[in-house]
Each structure stands twice: as structure tokens, then as C-alpha cells.
């Protein structure tokens, strides 16, 4: 959909900045230590998701309950159809409205809405939280970033490389015998690519386990690649960039108290992916 194009994403800048600012003020009002994920990263990701898809404000809380929380599939479908009906009667310039106005059947549109409701949200929250963990564990890089605000696109790319969320991507099946980098693969065998491994491959990256915000980042695989690459990756970049910029501009001193990301994390389905964990911070405004 065109709502995720470069041009469209650029038009979201003001709205994204406003929702980040609103959530930042909420974060700053919390008693410390405060969980960055609970009070900043996840709410920003959910609000941004709802905004772009076209979920009205009055239905966002129910979106969080049904598609972020754990409920039955029946409840999810019921809510999805309520959103569908609302957008059918109240169309706007958003993803869901554009899908409804397309030539797709209602069943096809509902299927795509379900995919959008369950995709991309966790990865943005994960990237915001783990980026802050990475920066706080690399104070010289944090200092470099503070001295060069707003956060540059190059810095965002390096953070995405360094903090990749997906352990594996969806498997693909070889249609014929082939050989890749000396590895023979027979027709019918499944192949699963690991962004975490590729993003830390010493044959591709110089000092891959070192965070270098001034690194000239090549094509990392944090958002996949090609026709199956993440549809919302440009929007994710904007949200991550704006969130880190506002956070670092508003807080002078930040201390990492604890981070669940440092411990082995469970895998979520249907692909192997790190789950978003708590990141407790203390800070001075």
C-alpha cells in the first residue's frame, strides 16, 4: 500500500513527533526507576500503529486489549469486524480505508487487516528499548549521539543492525538444487535466514560486535529484504529516530538499572524473535 511509501511516511513526521512528545511527558512524570518499555516504547508503538492504520481513538484501548493482550481468536475477529464496519461508514486517508475502497473482497480485506494488526508493533517497541540499552552500555557512543542531535539516519541504521530482533525469518523452500556460498541445498529443503547472524557476520562487518554510530552501514537484514521485506520499515525508522531524539534531548543523565533484554529471552511465534522486555531507568531531566 502507498501509505507506507517514502512520501507518505514523510507526511507523518508531525503526527509521530506529537505522539512521541505526549508519551515522553508521561514517562517523565512516573516514579523512578521507570520501565521504559511499559511507559514509552510500547505505548508509542501502539499509538503509531493505530494512527497509520486508521483505528479511531475511541477504539485504540480495545485494540490494545485484543491484539496486544492475550484473548481468544473469536474476540480478535469480533473487534476487527467492528473496526472494518466503522471505517466502511467513516472512511479516511488511512491504510484500512484504502483497503476497503480497493477491489479486494471483504474476506481478503479482513485477512490483510489481521496481518497489519499483528505485525510490526513489537519490533518498533523492541528497537526503541534495546537501542537505549545498547547506548547506555556504550557511553562513548551515547556521548557522540548527544553531541549530534537529532539522531541521524546513519545512527538508526547501525542501531538496527546491532539490535536485530529477528533470530530467523520465514523459511523458504528451494525449488531446485543450488549452491550458496559453498553450501549445497537440494530441491525441497527449507532455508531459514538469520538476521542476527548476518548482521554480526565478520566477513561483512568490521568489528561486528562493536556499536559504531558513525559506521557506514551496508544492507543489514533487520527488516528482511526484497519483495518480502518489512512493508512498514520506513515508518519504523521514523518512529525510532524521533523517539530516541526526543528522549535524549529531554533527559540529561540516564542510568540503566536493569534490562530484561540482557537475559536469554523466549522465542515468539511464528518466527524466532526476541520478545520485548522491561528496561528500568533512572534519570535527571
Positions of predicted regions on the chain:
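Cytochrome P450
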Residues: 1-285
Amino acid at each position: 500500500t502507498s501509505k507506507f511509501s517514502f512520501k507518505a511516511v514523510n507526511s507523518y513526521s508531525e503526527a509521530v513527533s506529537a505522539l512521541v512528545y505526549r508519551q515522553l511527558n508521561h514517562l517523565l512524570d512516573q516514579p523512578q526507576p521507570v520501565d521504559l518499555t511499559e511507559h514509552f516504547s510500547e505505548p508509542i508503538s501502539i499509538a503509531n500503529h493505530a494512527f497509520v492504520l486508521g483505528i479511531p481513538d475511541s477504539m485504540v484501548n480495545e485494540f490494545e486489549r485484543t491484539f496486544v493482550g492475550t484473548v481468544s481468536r473469536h474476540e480478535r475477529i469480533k473487534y476487527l469486524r467492528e473496526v472494518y464496519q466503522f471505517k466502511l461508514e467513516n472512511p479516511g486517508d488511512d491504510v484500512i480505508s484504502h483497503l476497503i475502497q480497493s477491489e479486494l473482497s471483504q474476506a481478503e480485506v479482513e485477512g490483510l487487516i489481521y496481518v497489519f494488526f499483528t505485525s510490526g508493533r513489537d519490533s518498533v517497541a523492541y528497537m526503541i528499548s534495546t537501542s537505549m540499552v545498547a547506548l547506555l552500555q556504550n557511553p562513548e557512543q551515547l556521548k557522540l549521539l548527544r553531541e549530534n542531535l537529532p539522531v541521524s539516519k546513519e545512527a538508526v541504521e547501525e542501531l538496527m543492525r546491532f539490535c536485530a530482533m529477528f533470530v530467523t525469518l520465514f523459511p523458504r523452500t528451494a525449488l531446485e538444487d543450488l549452491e550458496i556460498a559453498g553450501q549445497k541445498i537440494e530441491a525441497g529443503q527449507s532455508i531459514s535466514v538469520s538476521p542476527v547472524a548476518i548482521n554480526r557476520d565478520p566477513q561483512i562487518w568490521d568489528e561486528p560486535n562493536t556499536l559504531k554510530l558513525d559506521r557506514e552501514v551496508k544492507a543489514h537484514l533487520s527488516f528482511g529484504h526484497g519483495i518480502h521485506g518489512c512493508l512498514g520499515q520506513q515508518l519504523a525508522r521514523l518512529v525510532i529516530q524521533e523517539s530516541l531524539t526526543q528522549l535524549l534531548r529531554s533527559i540529561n543523565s540516564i542510568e540503566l538499572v536493569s534490562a530484561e533484554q540482557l537475559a536469554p529471552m523466549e522465542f515468539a511465534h511464528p518466527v524466532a524473535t526476541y520478545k520485548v522486555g522491561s528496561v528500568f531507568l533512572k534519570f535527571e531531566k
